[in-house]
Amino acid sequence: MSAPIIAIDAMGGDFGPRNIVQASLACLTATPSLHLALVGQASLIEELIASHAAVDRSRLRVVNATESIAMDERPSQALRGKSDSSMRVALELVSSGQAQACVSAGNTGALMALSRYVLKTLPGIDRPAMIAAIPTRTGHCQLLDLGANVDCSAEALYQFAVMGSVLAETLGVTKPRVALLNVGTEDIKGNQQVKLAAGLLQAAAGLNYIGYVEGDGVYRGEADVVVCDGFVGNVLLKSSEGLATMIAARIDALFNRNLLSRAVGALALPLLRRLQIDLAPARHNGASLLGLQGVVVKSHGSASVSGFQSAIQRAIVESREDLPQRLKGRLEVMFADGRT
C-alpha cells in the first residue's frame, strides 16, 4: 500500500487538538505518500491548520464530529451515548474503507469498546490486546498485553503470543523469540494460567516459543515478544517509562553538578544525547490494538508532539504491511486444530 490514509482522532488526549494537529502536519511533511483525515471539531481544527504554513491540503481532509469523549468517561457511555464522537467517527472511516488506520490519544477503555463494536475482532480472537515496543539492551521487544485485559486465560495468552509474533515479523524480525513473562524460568514457577499457556505454546507449530522470561531478562533482550496479562504488562510498561525518565534526569544532574562535571559532560554530550533519544518514552509511544479487523494505534494521552508522531508512524507501518490480513492468515493456520 503506497499511499496510506490514516484517520486521526483530533480531540483525544490530555492536551486536545493542538499537539495532535501539529504532530499530524509534521508527519504529513515527512511522509510524502501519507494522507490524513483529522476528525473532530472542524472549525477548531481548521483554525489550528491555518496557523501552519505550506500545508498540502490535497493530502489532508477535516471530518467534522460534534462530540468528544472525556478521558474519565465510562466506555459504556462512549459506546451508547456518543454516536458522533471524534473517536467513533475515526474508527468508522476505517470500517468503511475510507482510511486504513486510526490513531487516538483518547480514553483507552472507550477506544477498546468502540474498536470492538465498529471494527469487530478477527475470527478466533476473543479480545484484542495492546502491544508496544520497549527498549532493551539489544534493541527493543514487543510487550503485550498492556492493560486492555487485566485478567487473562491461558487461551488468551496463547492468542496474544501468536499475534505478537506476527507483528514482530512485520517489523522485520526473523523467527521472533516468544516468551511468557514469569517470576522464574523453571517449569514449576508461575500461576495456573501461565503454566497452561506454556503448554499451549509448546505445542504450537510455527511459533518460536522459548519458554519463560523474568523481568530482568526482558531488558537483556532475551525475547523479541514478551506475553503477559494486562495488569502485569501495564505495570512493567509504566515502570520502564518512569525508569528511563529518571535515568535521563539523573544523568543531567550528574553532569551539571560543578564546573569539572560540566566539562566532562560536554565531551560526552553526543553519546548522552543518543542514549536519551534511545530511551525516551516518546520514541516508543504508540500501542497497537491487535486482533481487530483494522489497524488501531493508541497514543499516550499525555504524549508530546514527537510522541504522537511516533504513534502515527506505527500506524503507517502496520497499514502498509496490511497487518490485520496477515494476522488473519496466520491465525487460520495456528488455530487449525480447532482451539479457539
Curated annotation (Swiss-Prot):
One GO CC annotation, please? cytoplasm
Enzyme Commission number(s): 2.3.1.274
Highest taxon of source: Bacteria
Pathway field: Lipid metabolism; phospholipid metabolism
Q: Which reaction does it catalyse?
A: a fatty acyl-[ACP] + phosphate = an acyl phosphate + holo-[ACP]
Q: Which Pfam families match?
A: FA_synthesis
Question: Could you state a single Gene Ontology molecular function term?
Answer: phosphate:acyl-[acyl carrier protein] acyltransferase activity
Record-linked InterPro entries = FA_synthesis, Phospholipid_synth_PlsX-like
* GO biological process entries: fatty acid biosynthetic process; phospholipid biosynthetic process
Alphabetized UniProt keyword annotations: Cytoplasm, Lipid biosynthesis, Lipid metabolism, Phospholipid biosynthesis, Phospholipid metabolism, Transferase
Compartments where found: Cytoplasm
Q: What class of enzyme is it?
A: transferase
Which family would the database say this protein is a member of?
A: Belongs to the PlsX family.
Chain's role:
Catalyzes the reversible formation of acyl-phosphate (acyl-PO(4)) from acyl-[acyl-carrier-protein] (acyl-ACP). This enzyme utilizes acyl-ACP as fatty acyl donor, but not acyl-CoA.
Q: How does it assemble?
A: Homodimer. Probably interacts with PlsY.
Recorded protein name is: Phosphate acyltransferase
This protein's species is Pseudomonas syringae pv. tomato (strain ATCC BAA-871 / DC3000)
Protein encoded by which gene: plsX
